[in-house]
Swiss-Prot record:
Keyword vocabulary terms for this entry: Metal-binding, Phosphoprotein, Zinc
Protein name: CXXC motif containing zinc binding protein
Lineage: Eukaryota, Metazoa, Chordata, Craniata, Vertebrata
Source organism of the structure: Rattus norvegicus
Pfam families, A to Z: CXXC_Zn-b_euk
MF term (GO), any: zinc ion binding
Length: 160
C-alpha cells in the first residue's frame, strides 16, 4: 500500500507553528482494510510512542490489528521524520503534517483532538494543549493584546 500523507488546511489568525506535541500525541483515524475494504466504525488512535512487533520478526509498527471481516493482519506506522508544523505561510493551503507507512491499513478519516500547540506570530507566546475537535480554536495573546485563532480545519489523505 505504501506511504500515505495526512494534509491539513486551516485559517490561522495571529498564530504559527501549529504542531502535534510529544510522542504520546494521539492521531485519531478511521481505517480501511486494504484486503476486503472494511472500514472501522470507531475512531482508533495511534501514537509515536507505541511499537508493536509484526509477526515473523518483520519489524514493528505503531498499530497492528486483525481485520474483523477477513481476519488479515494489517499494520500502520507513523513516520516520525515526516511530522511537520503548519505555519502562517501555509495559511488556507493543504500541507503535509505527517506520513504513515501503510501495510494493509489505509486511513480514510482523521479527527483532530487535543495535544496541538502553536505560537503567536508577533509575540512568540506559546499556546499549548490546543483542541481542534470542533475544527476551530480561539484564545487571546496578552503580549500583543490580539485575539488568536485557528479556523476551518480540514484535511485530506494523499498517496506519496
Amino acid at each position: 500500500m505504501g506511504k500515505i500523507a495526512l494534509q491539513l488546511k486551516a485559517t490561522l489568525e495571529n498564530v504559527t507553528n501549529l504542531r502535534p506535541v510529544g510522542e504520546d500525541f494521539r492521531w485519531y483515524l478511521k481505517m480501511k482494510c486494504g484486503n476486503c475494504g472494511e472500514i472501522s466504525e470507531k475512531w482508533q488512535y495511534i501514537r509515536l510512542m507505541d511499537s508493536v512487533a509484526l509477526k515473523g520478526g518483520r519489524g514493528s509498527a505503531s498499530m497492528v490489528q486483525k481485520c474483523k471481516l477477513c481476519a488479515r493482519e494489517n499494520s500502520i506506522e507513523i513516520l516520525s521524520s515526516t511530522i511537520k508544523s503548519y505555519n502562517a505561510e501555509d495559511n488556507e493551503k493543504f500541507k503535509t503534517i505527517v506520513e504513515f507507512e501503510c501495510r494493509g491499513l489505509e486511513p480514510v478519516d482523521f479527527q483532530p483532538q487535543a495535544g496541538f500547540a502553536a505560537e503567536g506570530v508577533e509575540s512568540g507566546t506559546v499556546f499549548s494543549d490546543i483542541n481542534l475537535q470542533e475544527k476551530d480554536w480561539t484564545d487571546y495573546d496578552e503580549k500583543t493584546q490580539e485575539s488568536v485563532g485557528i479556523f476551518e480545519v480540514t484535511h485530506q489523505f494523499v498517496k506519496c
